[in-house]
Amino acid sequence: MASHAGSRIARISKVLVANRGEIAVRVIRAARDAGLPSVAVYAEPDAESPHVRLADEAFALGGQTSAESYLDFAKILDAAAKSGANAIHPGYGFLAENADFAQAVIDAGLIWIGPSPQSIRDLGDKVTARHIAARAQAPLVPGTPDPVKGADEVVAFAEEYGLPIAIKAAHGGGGKGMKVARTIDEIPELYESAVREATAAFGRGECYVERYLDKPRHVEAQVIADQHGNVVVAGTRDCSLQRRYQKLVEEAPAPFLTDFQRKEIHDSAKRICKEAHYHGAGTVEYLVGQDGLISFLEVNTRLQVEHPVTEETAGIDLVLQQFRIANGEKLDITEDPTPRGHAIEFRINGEDAGRNFLPAPGPVTKFHPPSGPGVRVDSGVETGSVIGGQFDSMLAKLIVHGADRAEALARARRALNEFGVEGLATVIPFHRAVVSDPAFIGDANGFSVHTRWIETEWNNTIEPFTDGEPLDEDARPRQKVVVEIDGRRVEVSLPADLALSNGGGCDPVGVIRRKPKPRKRGAHTGAAASGDAVTAPMQGTVVKFAVEEGQEVVAGDLVVVLEAMKMENPVTAHKDGTITGLAVEAGAAITQGTVLAEIK
C-alpha cells in the first residue's frame, strides 16, 4: 500500500492479527465492530488461547517460541495468503515496529495497518529519532549523536556530562535494553547487559547514551495522524509507575501538569510526527524532571499497551482509527479533544510483587475479573489458561474511568478488591497497595511517584506468593489429529484425553498417558538467603555466569544472569566466600529453586 494520499488506496476487507494475548483479542473485537472478518495466528502454547477462539479463522504457526512463530515473516505472510486476508494488524511488540516486516507486507500486496516502513525505521532508530526531534525543536537532554562502539565511549560520555547516564537500545523500547549507570565502575557490565537484552528483544544490539534525569515522571502524548498530513493529539498519559523501566500503571490525562507543560507536549509531539511524515497511531514519550524540565524520550510507532485510558477519556476507538487511516480516510476529528473525566489502567502481570516482581509463570486456575460502572477489562486469558515463560508476563489490563481522578481511584480500589486470579502470582497486591498510597494519590501540590519510585522509595510489605501450583508442561499430553472441514485438510492439537479413540475407551495410537507429577501446594523456593546454595529465584533460562569456579565473591556480587518473560534478572551472592560447584551452563532452562552454584 502506498504511504501517500495521492495514490489509489485499497480498502481493508479481512484482517489478520499478527499477535497474541489481550491485544489480539482487542483488535479482533474492533474488526468485528467494523464489520470485518478476522484471522488469528498462534504458536503451539497458545493453541487454546481466547484470541484463537474469538477470531473468525485461526492458523497455526507452529513453534514454541516467539522466534519460531510470531516473529517469523514467512509463516505470517503464508497464513495471510491461505486465509485471504488483505490486511495485517501487528498489535504491539513482536513485529509491530519492524520496518522490514512492514515492507514485506506491502510487497506482498497487503495493507499494512501502521505507519510507513520509513517512519518506523527512522523513529525506531532512537538516534535518528533524536535528530528528528532536534529538527522539530523538541526539548532534549544531552546524548550521543550516534550509537556507541563500546563501553569506553560510554565511560567518556559519563566523564564529560556526569552521572547518572542511561544506556539504551537504539532499535527498541519498552525498557528492554535499557540500563542506568550511577557509577563509572558498573558501566562495562551494564553496557554488556544492555547489548544482550537489545539483541534478544530486537535483533540488534546497538546502544546510545544520554544523560539520565533522576526521579523523572514519564509523560506521553497519544498521536493519530492520517495520510493527508493531519495530526491530532488524542490526549496525554502519565506512566511513571514502572519496575525495571516497564510500565505497571498508566493514567489519562496526565495529572499535575501546568498548562505550559501540556501545551509544550502537545505541540512538540505534532511537530515531531510531521517532521517524520508519520501516519497511524503512535506515542511520543517524554521525561519530566522534578524541576519541570521536559525532555523528549522516544516515539513508539504502534498502538501502546495503555491506549485504553486515552480511549476512555477522549471517546475515540484508536483501533478503528487505525483501520480508517490504513484505508486512506481523513481523520474524523480536527482538533485535540478535551478530556472527559479520568481513567487509570493497571497491568495484570504474572509477577510476584512480594519477591521484587520476579516473573512467575504458571497455570491460571481461576480468573474472575471485576465489572460494574466505569470498569473495563481487556484480557487475553481465562480460567484454565497457562502462562508460560516463552512470552511476556501480561495476563490482562484493568481500566477504570471516573468523572475525575478521585472517582477513578475509588473505582480502582473497588475493582481491584473484586479481581480474583488464582494459580500463579500476579501484581494485583501491588495495585491494591498503590491506590491507597499517599505518594500516588497526591494532593494539591501533585504526587511524588517517579519512574524509579517502586525500586527506591516504595515500602514493599507484600508477602511472597505461596498459593500456586508449579507449571507442569506434561500434565496434559496432547495429540495432533488431522480432520477435514468442508474438504479442507486441517491439523488440530487436542488434549490426549479428548482425542479420538478406537471407540472402546482405549488410548489413541501414539498417545502416551503420563501420570501427572505430584503437586505441592504452597511450595515456594527463592534465592538462598542463608546456607551455601545460590538458587534460581524463578523459572527461566541461564544467560551467563559472571563468576568462575574458585572465584572469591562478596555479598551483592553478580553471580548469574537469568532471563524470563523477555527480561534479564540478576542473581547475586548472598554472602562472602568462594564459588564452587557451578551446576548449570549458559543456555540451560531451569526451574525455580534450581541450585546454580555454592558459596563456601
From Swiss-Prot:
It catalyses: N(6)-biotinyl-L-lysyl-[protein] + hydrogencarbonate + ATP = N(6)-carboxybiotinyl-L-lysyl-[protein] + ADP + phosphate + H(+). It is an enzyme of class 6 (ligase). Residues 130-327 form the ATP-grasp domain. Carboxylase activity of the AccA3/AccD5 complex is stimulated by interaction with the epsilon subunit AccE5. Activity of the AccA3/AccD6 complex is inhibited by interaction with AccE5 and by dimethyl itaconate, C75, haloxyfop, cerulenin, and 1,2-cyclohexanedione. The keyword Nucleus does not apply. Its cofactor is Mg(2+); Mn(2+); biotin. This is Biotin-dependent acyl-coenzyme A carboxylase alpha3 subunit. It comes from Mycobacterium tuberculosis (strain ATCC 25618 / H37Rv).
